Regions:
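N-terminal lobe/hinge region of extracytoplasmic solute-binding protein
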Residues: 184-232, 265, 335, 455
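Detector for C-terminal structural segments
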Residues: 17-30, 52-181, 185-189, 199-205, ...
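Ligand-site clamp/hinge motif
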Residues: 39-41, 46, 328, 358-403
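Secretory targeting signatures
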Residues: 1-4, 430, 441, 512-592
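Short, well-ordered beta-strand elements
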Residues: 7-18, 40-43, 177-188, 228, ...
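Aromatic- and charge-enriched surface segment that lines or borders ligand/interaction sites
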Residues: 228-272, 288, 294, 381-384, ...
Length: 592
């Protein structure tokens, strides 16, 4: 990647105030980095403002949380330069041909040992060079009304996006009309468009209305969904899927292979946020018959089934979407095949869904209605749960309220491995890129302190893009021990120094360590040098012409520029030297 520098290490640092796990982390990290000369100016924005800025690379830096997936490629693909386009879905836009090559080799790897080695290599490279810096994985802590039962607790937390199972089978009463599930969101969803939604609030709603081809179970294993079975060719490039028969769209139209072919073909062709990454994997999608399709891949891809199950690739109805610009589709009245039908939405206030009576899983869902309410403040959401106005909330309960919840017999506290990887990112696409600064930041952040202060100790420090809690053996064991002095040293050697004493480092150019020369043994005894009197030195300087001084200055500037010292910094030094010489001349004349 091409180096992009700025005058000083000062960045606008955006954060979402309603997501405390990342927002509080942002405060702590800003203070930690200030100690090594990096200034992050915290600016809290609502998601309706912050997300468009991030998606269009109109930012300097930000703190946020990234939902996890058991598919390593879901994480790694976002670092491919092909996704460095506004609105495509990679917020941090890493542009490195070497990283691209590694990702492409991973996609094609068929040998497990080679696959493992490549994944280790790319994690180490990204950890030391990328503007994406992971901080910690949350531990999910969620409060729910005690009357609800038969929910599933799986990685990611209760009722998270991958947990369709709770929304299918949990209930609180034997009377169907009483099984109305009310959930509080801190902010409204951004989209009902399955092709373009990137936030987990939007995807939570979309996940209930639409279906993917495959899903994962509570053990993170791939299971059939709209696709009932599959076969893989010997060369690993062709996947043939049998589709579920008897499924209907919410408007009564039968679901067929045409819908699947349309969804993936147009999603990729129109470079939509959710499907764009598949352009590097899928060559084409073909209809075999009304209930059989083929995915023909460009190369073998070891994680393809997991990709389909966890990539949020929801199938849409061709008869509704054909001819639309899918990137601009507002989708005001979603029509899916999922367990719930869209009923009503008042933007900024609530969304209502109702049970799909013709859902293809018999007896599901048990819930008859879902009501999402927007309640911005964490304490207000908690009080609404206590009062029975809502049953739970979309994200984890604020840690400061958990102990209070444990004492209430009407509430239950559910813990699980968290879904959210809290991270910070810098805009390396248009604003700043210096891998040495990012490496220094890795050492300057005390992750244990961040976990403790930002999330009450509910979390796990993370140093690389993959982590053992979601990716098992594929996660690197690389760590960066908290060491602010090492961070300072890296910054100094990279040419970042605080030259004006304001606590923020400026760029003066990299320093080149000098290697002392080994003295040679003289062949003849040295004579004792005669030390000239001070006035003799000054007199000599007096006779130095202005032209000579200029020549010396020019020569020194030229020489040092070759080794990377900026001319501006050196010129200032020479001016100071000349002033000192003039003062010495003046003093010498006075003494005469």
């Amino acid at each position: 990647m091409k180096k992009i520098v700025k005058e000083e290490l000062k960045f606008e640092f955006m954060s979402l105030p309603w997501f405390p796990q990342s927002d509080k982390a942002a405060e702590i990290i800003a203070k930690q980095l200030e100690k090594v000369g990096i200034k992050l100016e915290l600016r809290r924005l609502e998601s309706s403002i912050m997300y468009p800025k991030i998606e269009n690379f109109e930012y300097e830096s930000y703190a946020l949380a990234w939902s996890q997936s058991p598919n390593p490629m879901y994480m790694l693909n976002t670092f491919h330069s092909s996704l460095c386009k506004p609105g495509i879905g990679s917020f941090w836009c890493h542009e490195d041909p070497d990283v691209d090559k590694l990702i492409e080799e991973i996609r094609e790897a068929t040998d497990k040992t080679k696959l493992y080695e490549l994944i280790m290599e790319i994690q180490e490279k990204l950890a030391k060079e990328s503007g994406f810096i992971p901080i910690y994985l949350t531990q999910s802590v969620k409060v729910i009304r005690a009357e609800w039962k038969n929910y599933t607790v799986m990685s990611g937390g209760l009722i998270e996006t991958f947990d369709i199972w709770s929304m299918l089978y949990m209930y609180k009463s034997e009377k169907p009309e009483e099984n109305v599930f009310k959930i509080a969101f801190p902010s409204d969803i951004l989209s009902t468009n399955p092709f373009m939604a990137v936030d987990l609030r939007s995807l939570w709603i979309i996940n209930l209305v639409y279906d993917p081809l495959l899903r994962i179970d509570k053990d993170l294993k791939v299971v059939p969904w709209l696709a009932t079975s599959w076969e893989v060719s010997e060369d690993g490039k062709t996947y043939t899927f049998k589709l579920r028969k008897g499924v209907k769209w919410h408007d009564g139209t039968p679901f067929t292979a045409d819908d699947v072919v349309f969804t993936f073909t147009e999603g990729i062709k129109q470079e939509t946020s959710r499907f764009a990454a598949l352009a590097e994997i899928i060559d084409k999608v073909e209809k075999v018959d009304d209930y059989t399709i083929k995915f023909i891949l460009k190369t073998p891809y070891p994680f393809f089934l997991l990709e389909l199950a966890t990539g949020y690739y929801y199938v849409v109805p061709k008869h509704v979407c054909e001819g639309l610009d899918l990137r601009k589709w507002e989708n005001p009245e979603p029509v899916g095949t999922g367990p719930f039908k869209f009923v009503e939405r008042v933007v900024g206030e609530y969304i209502v869904l109702e049970k799909n009576e013709e859902f293809w899983i018999k007896g599901a869902p048990k819930i008859t209605k879902v009501i999402m309410r927007v309640i911005p403040e964490a304490e207000s959401r908690f009080l609404a749960i206590k009062a029975g106005e809502v049953d739970t909330e979309r994200y984890d309960t604020a840690i400061t309220l958990v102990e209070q919840a444990k004492k209430d017999p009407n509430l239950k506290v559910i813990t699980a491995p968290g879904l959210w990887l809290v991270y910070i990112a810098f805009n390396t696409h248009t604003h700043f890129y210096d891998p040495k600064v990012f490496e220094a930041i890795q050492y300057a952040i005390n992750r244990e302190e961040v976990v403790e202060k930002a999330n009450g100790g509910y979390g796990y420090p993370v140093y690389t893009v993959l982590n053992k809690y979601w990716h098992g053996d594929y996660a690197s064991t690389l760590t960066f021990e908290y060491n602010p002095e090492k961070a300072k040293q890296i910054l100094e050697e990279a040419g970042w120094k605080d030259i004006d004493g304001d606590g923020i480092r400026e760029y003066v150019g990299p320093t080149t360590p000098t290697t002392p020369t080994t003295p040679t043994t003289p062949t003849t005894p040295p004579t004792t040098p005669t030390t000239p009197a001070p006035y003799t030195i000054i007199t000599t300087v007096i006779h130095t012409t202005t032209e000579t001084i200029t020549q010396i200055s020019t020569a020194v500037i030229t020489t040092t520029a070759v080794v990377g010292v900026p001319t501006e910094a050196l010129t200032g030094t020479i001016i100071i030297i000349v002033i000192l010489i003039i003062l010495l001349i003046y003093v010498a004349r006075k003494r005469r």
